[in-house]
Amino acid sequence: LYAVGCKARVLEIWTDVPGMMTSNPKVVPTARTISHISYKAALELSHFGAKVIYPPTIQPVVAEGIPIYVKNTFGPEAHGTLIEKNPPRSKDSVIGISNSDNIALLSLEGSGMVGIPGFSSRLFETLSQNDINIILITQASSVHTMCIAVSEKDAEKAREAADKCFAYEISLGKLNPLKVEKGFSIVCLVGDDV
């Protein structure tokens, strides 16, 4: 916010890492620093686990088109990462790999979903009213199954809320009770053409 309010030419974020990395160096020892990256790719990496930037706090800077430099406090001479609207195009299709652990998959299934509008919006509204963030959504082409990913800590609350919301359809056998599976991770490939 200060960078926007001051009409800064650049925002510098000083941290304990050399910049945004191609992957988590604790998991992948050969991870490299990304020298240039677009706002979009940086936000995607951070959404799925890269902790160098926090999307809500940099949204005003992104909206104003202010470049962001991520630099290392312990190695200030290093280039770091420049996050900007139109960075030089990378020779690699995949710029980075990010992940989120402790994910639960919630599956809403049943023949009663086919051809009936509104199931998705009802589920999303119910989860929203219960302060449950949806991380990922997928729906089978048959429209018979919808699967969403949430944090494991929200899984049981989501099950209770969804089963209550769809109690009538479940009682008629048109839908199955929400199926919860835990112990998953999401791996995200980020790149200009990915």
Regions found by a protein language model. Give the residues of each.
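C-terminal catalytic "cap/lid" subdomain
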Residues: 1-194
